[in-house]
């Protein structure tokens, strides 16, 4: 064994953590997916686990909706991981019991004891820090969030430092798989908390966030917890090019591995047809996403859109069409949409007729009504996206 290997083991033992690893032992970054295939396509699988992600943009842009969507998918993922591990351990226990030896019985008892403790802890949880006090529980449930299982933190008169410390303490337990802070500008730092309203202050919460980022980052990595900070935008008065900035200071931006900007785009009717900005009764809108920064995937898919329906939530089927066109599972020719096989030829049905649809509305109806066709498209889409994201 090399001297450096001995020293690495010594250092890891000293600090009681695996802080030094050989390159081949580096853990691949896991992702929590969006429901939107377009958002997953842009980010190569979703937001990174063990790192900080920022959702920022103007009011009504889709930041909170997208964060709640991630919460719902995180809960599903945590439950699946929990059940898979439980089933795996139960299988191991059964195999040990079949051996019927003293040693195997001892191992089985130990595994059962560990399993009971694991089951008692349950799946990992989502923490939502509602600093804005504006969380709509019904909307969250519509998006698929199990609000009963989610831990909701609603600060009353706590300072930014206290709220951020609460987040660190909860993440450090190891039971939290995702923490969302909504939103950064609503936090008030200690140095201005007790000041009068008319007294000028400088720096805002930058200092508190600087300390927070330094403290929380190792916990996120060690506990494999994802963190989303929702942020607003401000007009940059110092710029002559009508640019915008975000509160929180430079350290916050540096600490974020992924920064996504959300914009409210075109209004839509019930059939996803475009409406004017003055439409009185829109049924939804497109949500524009721009990757402002990424350190966890290639930055080659900077801009995309997903469809938001005001009564049903995220319109996954409309998104499936968009991404299927990118991967040539579907092909558009004029107003017609063609379903392609893996060789790029138009698929035919049992009567040897081409599988094609005139207009996006017809294709959407087919995806809604033909479960077999929908599952086939989703299966092929998942396959190519999974292989690409590995």
State where each predicted segment sits.
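C-terminal regions of RecA-like/P-loop NTPase motor modules
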Residues: 1-21, 88-119, 267-390
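The Walker A/P-loop phosphate-binding site
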Residues: 2-149, 172, 357
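Residue-level preference for the first positions of well-ordered beta-strands
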Residues: 52-54, 125, 177-180, 226
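Phosphate-binding/switch loop-helix module in NTP-utilizing enzymes
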Residues: 115-116, 155-225
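A short alpha->loop->secondary-structure connector
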Residues: 121, 143-150, 195-204, 244-249
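Residues immediately C-terminal
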Residues: 134, 186, 235
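Phosphate-binding/switch region of NTP-binding enzymes
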Residues: 170, 202-327
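N-terminal cationic and glycine-rich segments that engage phosphates or anionic surfaces
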Residues: 192, 235-239, 333-336, 351
């Amino acid at each position: 064994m090399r001297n450096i290997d001995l020293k690495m083991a010594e250092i890891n033992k000293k600090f009681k953590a695996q802080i030094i690893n050989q390159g081949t032992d580096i853990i691949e970054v896991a992702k929590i997916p969006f429901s939107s295939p377009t958002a997953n396509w842009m980010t190569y699988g979703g937001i990174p686990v063990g790192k900080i992600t920022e959702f920022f943009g103007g009011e009504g842009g889709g930041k909170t909706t997208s964060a709640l969507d991630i919460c719902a998918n995180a809960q599903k993922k945590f439950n699946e991981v929990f059940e898979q591990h439980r089933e795996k351990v139960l299988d191991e226990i059964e195999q040990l019991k079949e051996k019927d030896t003293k040693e195997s019985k001892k191992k089985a008892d130990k595994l059962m004891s560990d399993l009971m403790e694991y089951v008692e802890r349950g799946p990992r949880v989502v923490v939502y820090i509602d600093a804005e006090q504006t969380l709509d529980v019904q909307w969250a449930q519509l998006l698929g969030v199990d609000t009963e299982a989610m831990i909701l933190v609603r600060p009353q008169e706590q300072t930014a430092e206290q709220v951020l410390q609460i987040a660190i303490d909860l993440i450090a337990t190891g039971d939290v798989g995702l923490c969302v802070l909504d939103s950064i500008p609503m936090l008030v730092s200690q140095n201005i908390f007790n000041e009068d309203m008319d007294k000028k202050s400088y720096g805002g919460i930058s200092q508190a966030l600087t300390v927070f980022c330094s403290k929380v980052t190792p916990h996120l990595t060690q506990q494999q917890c994802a963190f989303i900070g929702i942020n607003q935008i401000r007009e940059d008065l110092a710029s002559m090019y009508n640019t915008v900035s975000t509160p929180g200071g430079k350290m916050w931006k540096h600490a974020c591995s992924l920064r996504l900007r959300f914009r409210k785009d075109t209004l839509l009717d019930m059939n996803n047809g475009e409406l004017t900005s003055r439409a009185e009764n829109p049924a939804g809108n497109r949500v524009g996403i721009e990757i402002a920064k990424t350190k966890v995937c290639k930055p080659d898919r900077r801009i995309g859109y997903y469809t938001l329906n005001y009564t049903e939530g995220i319109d996954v089927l409309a998104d499936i069409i968009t991404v299927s066109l990118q991967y040539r599972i579907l092909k558009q020719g004029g107003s017609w949409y063609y379903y392609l096989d893996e060789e790029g030829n138009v698929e035919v049905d049992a009567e040897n007729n081409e599988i094609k649809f005139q207009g996006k509305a017809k294709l959407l109806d087919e995806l809604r009504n033909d479960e077999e066709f929908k599952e086939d498209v989703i299966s092929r889409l998942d396959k190519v996206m999974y292989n690409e994201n590995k």
